[in-house]
Amino acid sequence: MTEMPKKKFSPRSARGDKPRYGEQKPKLKRSGDKPRFNDDQPQGFKEKSDRFQDKPRPRTNDDKPRRAGDKPSNFKSRFKDKDRDKPRYGDDRPRRSGQKPPFGKTFPAAPPPMDSEQAQEALDLLYGHHAVLAALDGDRQLNRIWITSHLRHDIRYRTKIQTAKANGTVVDEVDNFRLNQITHNANHQGIAAQVAPYHYWELGDLIDKAKSQSTAPVLIIIDSITDPHNLGAIIRTAEAFGAQGMVLPQRRVAGITSTVMKVAAGALEHFPVARVVNLSRALETLKESGFWIYGTVAGKQTALHQADLREPMGLVIGSEGEGLSLLTQKHCDHLITIPLAGKTPSLNASVAAAISLYEIFRQRGFDRPTLSHTASDLREVSED
């Protein structure tokens, strides 16, 4: 028997006979086939396109001559020949209220609005029933009165307004809105008045008037009080207790302003105030005229209730912070103090003046002030 020849087997590759994904067996080229794109390049290599290479950029349009109506091609050339500092047409015209200034320009800030006290100082303004009625009853000249329609025919004002108008005072009938503008929203109660500046007394005339009114007159002397509210409160208290007048130095002390008049609530129309250049010289003049000078200080001095206060006297009141100056203390005959039992070291100037005035007039003949209502009247009010 003839033996068949043995078949020879080639060794099998480790990865198998099938090609992996993406691998293809080389195809036989047929007649007429064109080479595929990049068949002649090694696998994984791609030639860089020349379109991404740097090439000389063409000239910009700005180098070309422009035609009428063409706009600049970029932002920088837009302001190339423009003068930014040159004022534009219309910048010199006044602006309307509330209109914003143009961008990049600054204007001086508007002055801050005045508060009610500054407005009063600028106009010598009085407002409210007590202050205006006292001014109408007094000797001071009123330049102008602003009053609402319902108050003008009020029985309290009708005759007085007519008299003031006959004396040359301008009377304007306004509404509350206008009064709010004039007084800067203060509590005007429907009336305001512009008064002439206060006319100070001469010291000699004040002394003569005080002596003619009392055998033991009391004058208030102010030292270093710059707060107009304190000064107005002292004037009101002194006039209410029966003092004959006040002496003010020209410097380092608040003057008689509209704020002082408002706080005094009409007391200045019946309370003379003298103004002196030199306070020390004025104290010596008072001494020569028979007045004893008492200065109020804090410390271990004679207690207020232990001093004899029944003679003609001048009571010197200093500020809460500074007190009486050393020079003023040297010209005082006596230094008195208000005894305090608490932790507070001192009192407000107007409070100290009120306590001192009460003790002065208590020693002179009254034990307590007269009340405007009796106990029976108060009982009827409480029952209602």
From Swiss-Prot:
A single cellular component GO annotation: cytosol
Domain of life according to the entry: Bacteria
Residue numbers binding S-adenosyl-L-methionine: 318, 338, 347
Any GO BP: methylation
Bilayer-crossing regions: none
Residues covered by region (Disordered): 1-116
Pfam families: SpoU_methylase, SpoU_sub_bind
Protein's name in the database: Uncharacterized tRNA/rRNA methyltransferase slr0955
Organism from which the protein derives: Synechocystis sp. (strain ATCC 27184 / PCC 6803 / Kazusa)
